[in-house]
């Protein structure tokens, strides 16, 4: 069972961006909207991110970096942070997953997992 002081929940919504994609060149652009919510008992700050982006052929791109969209949000208990971003795949379907590296007010460092989610061109999955 996880410690109730350190509970960060992540939800993601995705959409295909046909206007930015070039299927004839195997370029499929997907937007994703992320909500990071602190359901723990202590304030916690997001320090960095780690993503694994896998295309339909199994090729994995690993992304690490500080913060999200240039910020390192501090979330009090019950607070959330939302941001939008995008990614490029060479296939019509893929997945993303990863984690946010957090530090709580008491100095405890922990990872907030981002469960795998699907990226798919509408109609690409049957």
Curated annotation (Swiss-Prot):
NCBIfam families: PRK05461.1. It holds the Pfam family DUF525. It comes from the Bacteria. GO terms for biological process: error-free translesion synthesis. SUPFAM superfamilies: ApaG-like (SSF110069). This is Protein ApaG. Residues 2-126 form the ApaG domain.
């Amino acid at each position: 069972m996880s410690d109730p002081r350190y509970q960060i929940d992540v939800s993601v919504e995705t959409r295909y961006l046909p206007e930015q994609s070039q299927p004839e060149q195997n370029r499929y652009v997907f937007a994703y909207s992320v909500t990071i919510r602190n359901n723990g008992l202590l304030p916690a700050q997001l320090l960095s991110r780690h993503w694994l982006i896998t295309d339909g052929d199994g090729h994995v791109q690993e992304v690490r970096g500080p913060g999200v969209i240039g910020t390192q949000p501090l979330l009090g208990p019950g607070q959330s942070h939302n941001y939008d971003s995008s990614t490029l795949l060479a296939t019509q379907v893929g997945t993303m997953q990863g984690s946010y590296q957090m530090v709580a007010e008491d100095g405890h460092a922990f990872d907030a997992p981002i469960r795998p989610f699907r990226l798919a061109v509408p109609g690409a999955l049957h």
